[in-house]
């Protein structure tokens, strides 16, 4: 199946052809400089000169469009190192003119004349738009130019850790993209099996939560009791920005295997009372940090309510991506005391059965540990309690540690229920020991929950989840919540 990376390169390949057509249509213009794909120091000078020519905007709109297309073609011909050097050049040499800004700010402070004040204010506003942003905005006029910029930022994000200078370029980039991708510009579309094959292929490539391994599997996710919705931008009409997959069922789902099981018969959507959002995938890496998800879920919930008035409950079946990693750290730091003999016996028997070291962290990494009923009975209660504790833990900014929790709680949902062994696929076991969580979207409460979360850091949760949290806190105060695996005696 097509991967995200191969889809990404396919997009860049098509851009090369499109923009070659742009340059051909206006007579080719200046011949492109011959540059090495890694950008040598001499090549950097050529690119810098070409960027300045783009900014001078000589020859009117047609010439500007041509030069932007040529610059884009040069970028697309670069390898990873060359693209990084290109972006470093943009960040370093095409930032705002600080001296000019200081000068204008001083004039603004000193002027007493209203007309003069407005004139200086406008000049300052113009000066605050960096040359690099004016350069990037030129791509907006090109065919697929917006998609190019989104993918350009995806490249930029991959280099941020290596060069702090690029962070300022990224901040400006976000500001630009936020304006272009305002929610008012976006279109919500219902994707079905009859949608274009190229679009369906992108769903397979971009699915980030539960991998789609075949066309048959995709078809199952688009059956009559399923829905898939995506946001699109008018300048990227064939590219989903974010999409959500929904199951129309009779109750809040507690097991993703059943949701994804293509052998189970479909149900009549008219009889469903519950909509389960079981997968939300951001399709464009270059739009990271621009939040469409909260609008998407609320928009889809409203759309479904109109189509199926019998739907009363809207909830997710969500992953808990870093719970297992957090648990490993906890096991390492907090230590354990022995529990009762039956508990120890179940743990030791499981260690023997799976031929692994007698340590809980090791046992939980065994791919089949969940198939031992004695072991799962022993671990269910303490792991669910610890998972509740994890979901309520906060970072220094008073926001939940878990990214998925931050997203849904920020949208006004509440932590409704934790589900034991809800995802026994390899990824589910690696990320969260198979546990999944339902976030409930009570449409009458979401605004109140959102406000309490944003202003006071309040995490809305059901009584069931609160009880798990209290039990975890009480048990942890008395003694460690998880038993220690003891080595067998000789």
Label each region the model flagged.
Residues 1-290, 294-490:
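Extended, composition-driven regions rather than compact fold-specific motifs
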